[in-house]
Amino acid sequence: LIVPLEETFFHRLADQTIETISDVVDDAIGDKIDVDLEAGILTIELDSGEQFIINKHALNRQIWMSSPVSGASHYDYDEDTESWRSTRGATTLHEQLAADLAVKTGHKIALD
């Protein structure tokens, strides 16, 4: 069930999600890529200069991701599964990012 989140809850949940992704990716492959979290915007830069950018979009209560593999995508929070689900399909933010990072780095990262 996807319902609009109360603003304070959204900010807390989105910030926590982005910070956790930053920590997990940095711990897993931070020696091979540049992971930077600043002002709530997560930038993952590959050696090629390509970037993944993940940030929250408060107006829509979504997390947005820009990926050099899958392009731009938006995610709503699904309370039933406690995950950020794509507005374009059944994929979660964690699944899409893990798949895209595997394509670009050859490393499979468990983000869930």
Where are these regions (language model features)?
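N-terminal intrinsically disordered, cationic/polar leader segments
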Residues: 2-112
